[in-house]
Amino acid sequence: MITTSGGGALICRSAEDANEIMWYATQARDAYPYYQHTAIGYNYRMSNVCAGIGRGQMKVLDAHIAHHKHVQALYEELLKDVPGVHIHKQPATGEYDSNFWLCTMTLDPQVKIKGQENAYKEVIKTAVGGAAGVIHQVDSPTTDCQPNDNVEALRVWMLNKKVECRPVWKPMHKQPVYAGTDVYTNGVEEEIFKVGMCLPAGPYVSDEDVRYIVDCIKEAIL
């Protein structure tokens, strides 16, 4: 919601917590006249320029949250009668007040999408999501944990309609970099990854945009 051009801010419960976090964030150096480390440190410090951006963004925080809540409500209303399509909602227990930074939907496995027969037939040449930088090319378009064919088909369909929709985040334990590590799971996160999709909901997404996105989703369903 507030990125400060890099990832946001961390609010701590105490000065002690803040001090420990900053120790890790500033290379975790021990008090010697040379570099010694008893823990693995990082270099997460925010520049003065980014801090200034963050202070400026705080002025529009309330407006951004209100906009995201409005977009979420509009998606819920426009998609409520579409069979097999479900917008992830806030639990109605009164315990939560989501800022709806991310608007997600799930697609039932039995829902058929136009072009579904071509899902995962070609290797992606660029990073999905407009990510900058260098990507590692792959030989196979499929992995052992991926969105269902209808979700991938809908992503491609929306992209062809000039709408960028992304899969939800792949579970960490299914990332190749963590292959072989211990994991304790009930499988829910893998099921969500198979059926989930993120919808556009940023500050520049208008009511007209949401209606167009919903119309494209409806058009894609067979």
Task: Identify what each model region corresponds to.
Residues 13-222:
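PLP-dependent aminotransferase class I/II
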Residues 1-10:
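Glycine-rich phosphate-binding loop of ATP-grasp-fold ATP-dependent ligases
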